[in-house]
């Protein structure tokens, strides 16, 4: 095993990984639409506000056409904050535009539509009540705004905006629902206050649901679009199970989720953005995944409430509608919510990704440019790994010096590879050359390289972030292929400085010769930020290797002169 072989293995592993990711995406690109699924529920719970005994059909699922036909006309309220523009009624947020995130960098580009009332691809967040013991509950036609025909807008001197709805039953039970929006915040607090002014107990359970018809291009992308590999589907978190996820294409193939969880959350993820229901920590809910025609549904059912006459009770939850901004997500203080920035489903790789982003974000705060932050990250990593890299460069310099002697050994032993290997190892031992000296630094860089790929793909902070000149979005590929071409030149020059081991298999040698071209082609399809990292890293590696070879040559000449004297 030598440095060249390790580099060859690393190169092919990188290419194979990206090809596998592309193959797996294309293999399942057709959305599997199942028939309507209704899930049964375990009911052996003994919590104060326990998840209710819910049977299949408790919340009947209807076909999309039935939902549209059955939907009554209700007042729709428009709400505008500094970050969100929404349409909502008493039950659902029907549409949500992210005002700080345009769809493109074109002048006048419209904002990203995260939730939408598009009849072909609806995506909404809903919360309501299901009756138990024949208690009356609100529906779309009776849960009404306290101030109809009013549009709400967060004023410049306001930090909070409250939008109230009210429902009152004939038996004296009322529910006052408030949507609370805060300046600069994507988490919406939805609070229900149930007041029983009647004469009989009121029994019902709350449900909270995310429902969408996935847009086909979410599932039908290609390697030429780096965000092809971003996870799209449902994720949830629990103290016991940790972070779990299921892609839209596998929504029901792995069996319906049917689990009682307290202190968790559930979300629907897409590239750079997500929606999530975050219930109260002290209230358990039943977590469900279901499909209704073409709709994918993530739902929380429960807890159940019994409100005695003359009593009042409340329940609340946060609804996140927005980007995967690490700083804002952290401020919510919700355990595990940072995993929605899905660097990897594997905890170790996710931790490496989080660490890299932490360094990048601090460098960006100093340099005010994510591209230069990537350059700074490369420099810091090279400094941190220099003690390891130094042995690699020294080993390469020694190998270069003794290359003629190795060639002589090869000619001496001809086809007898066993004797040649023995003589070569004796030479290595005598001259204190470590043929494995270059392996460790390369192996260390492998997880960093893959983790950084996901950081650049997943970090919405880098979305549409420019570097300089032709690079105007670090999360998309280089439009003019300048960085891939530079990478080819740098790899070719590095190969010229690195001696080809004597006795190297001719096929492996030819593969190494074409490796710069293979890597260059690969870099043409990855985010330009990753190509920038690889070019800067390779350039620094080339300079340091050239300097080490020169230093070693000067040292050898000095020793030769001393020996002559």
Swiss-Prot record:
GO CC, any one term: plasma membrane
Main location: membrane
Membrane topology of the entry: Multi-pass membrane protein
UniProt keyword list: Cell inner membrane, Cell membrane, Chaperone, Membrane, Protein transport, Transmembrane, Transmembrane helix, Transport
Transcription as UniProt keyword: no
Keyword Zinc set for record: no
Superkingdom to which the source organism belongs: Bacteria
Classification via CDD domains: 5TM_YidC_Alb3, EcYidC-like_peri
Membrane-spanning ranges: 6-26, 348-368, 370-390, 437-457, 479-499, 516-536
GO BP annotation list: protein insertion into membrane; protein transport
NCBIfam families: PRK01318.1-3 (NF002352), yidC_nterm (TIGR03593), yidC_oxa1_cterm (TIGR03592)
Function: Required for the insertion and/or proper folding and/or complex formation of integral membrane proteins into the membrane. Involved in integration of membrane proteins that insert both dependently and independently of the Sec translocase complex, as well as at least some lipoproteins. Aids folding of multispanning membrane proteins.
Subunit record text: Interacts with the Sec translocase complex via SecD. Specifically interacts with transmembrane segments of nascent integral membrane proteins during membrane integration.
Similarity remark: Belongs to the OXA1/ALB3/YidC family. Type 1 subfamily.
Protein name: Membrane protein insertase YidC
Lineage, uppermost ranks: Bacteria, Pseudomonadati, Pseudomonadota, Gammaproteobacteria, Lysobacterales
């Amino acid at each position: 095993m030598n440095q060249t072989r390790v580099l060859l293995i690393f190169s092919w592993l990188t290419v194979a990984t990206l090809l596998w990711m592309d193959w797996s995406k294309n293999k399942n690109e057709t959305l599997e639409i199942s028939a309507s699924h209704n899930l049964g529920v375990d009911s052996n719970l003994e919590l104060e506000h326990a998840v209710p005994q819910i049977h299949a059909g408790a919340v009947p699922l209807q076909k999309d056409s039935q939902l549209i036909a059955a939907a009554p006309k209700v007042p729709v309220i428009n709400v505008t904050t500094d970050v969100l523009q929404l349409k909502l009624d008493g039950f659902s947020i029907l549409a949500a535009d992210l005002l700080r995130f345009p769809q493109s960098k074109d002048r006048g580009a419209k904002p990203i539509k995260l939730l939408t009332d598009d009849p072909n691809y609806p995506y909404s967040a809903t919360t309501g009540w299901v009756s138990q013991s024949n208690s009356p509950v609100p529906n779309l036609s009776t849960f009404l705004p306290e101030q109809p025909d009013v549009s709400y807008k967060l004023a410049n001197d306001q930090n909070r905006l409250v939008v109230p709805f009210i429902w009152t039953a004939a038996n004296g039970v009322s529910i006052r629902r408030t949507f609370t929006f805060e300046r600069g915040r994507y988490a919406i607090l939805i609070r229900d206050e149930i007041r029983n002014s009647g004469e009989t107990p009121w029994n019902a359970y709350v449900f909270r649901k995310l429902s969408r018809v996935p847009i086909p291009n979410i599932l039908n992308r290609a390697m030429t679009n780096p965000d092809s590999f971003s996870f799209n589907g449902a994720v949830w978190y629990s103290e016991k199970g940790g972070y779990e996820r299921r892609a839209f294409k596998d929504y029901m193939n792995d069996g319906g989720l049917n689990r009682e969880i307290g202190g968790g959350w559930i979300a629907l993820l897409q590239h750079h953005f997500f929606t999530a229901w975050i219930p109260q920590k002290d209230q358990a809910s039943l977590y469900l995944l279901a499909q209704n025609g073409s709709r994918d549904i993530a739902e929380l059912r429960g807890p159940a409430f019994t409100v005695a006459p003359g009593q009042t009770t409340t329940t609340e939850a946060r609804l996140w509608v927005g980007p995967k901004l690490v700083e804002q997500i952290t401020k919510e203080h919700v355990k595990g919510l940072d995993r929605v920035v899905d660097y990897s489903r594997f905890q170790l790789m996710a931790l490496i990704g989080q660490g890299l982003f932490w360094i990048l974000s601090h460098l960006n705060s100093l340099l005010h440019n994510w591209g230069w932050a990537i350059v700074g990250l490369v420099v810091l990593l090279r400094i941190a790994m220099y003690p390891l890299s130094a042995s690699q460069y020294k080993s390469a310099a020694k190998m270069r010096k003794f290359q003629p002697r190795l060639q002589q050994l090869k000619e001496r032993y001809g086809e007898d590879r066993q004797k040649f290997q023995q003589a070569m190892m004796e030479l290595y031992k005598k001259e204190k050359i470590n043929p494995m000296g270059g392996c460790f630094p390369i192996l260390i860089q492998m997880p960093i390289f893959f983790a950084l790929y996901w950081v650049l793909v997943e970090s919405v902070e880098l979305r549409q972030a420019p570097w300089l000149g032709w690079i105007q979005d670090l999360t998309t590929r280089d439009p003019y292929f300048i960085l891939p071409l530079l990478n080819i030149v740098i790899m070719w020059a590095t190969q010229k400085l690195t001696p080809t081991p004597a006795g190297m298999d001719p096929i492996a040698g030819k593969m190494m010769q074409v490796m710069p071209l293979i890597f260059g082609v690969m870099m043409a399809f990855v985010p330009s930020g990753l190509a920038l990292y690889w070019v800067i890293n390779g350039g620094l590696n080339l300079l340091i290797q050239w300097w080490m070879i020169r230093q070693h040559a000067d040292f050898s000449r000095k020793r030769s002169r001393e020996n002559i004297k």
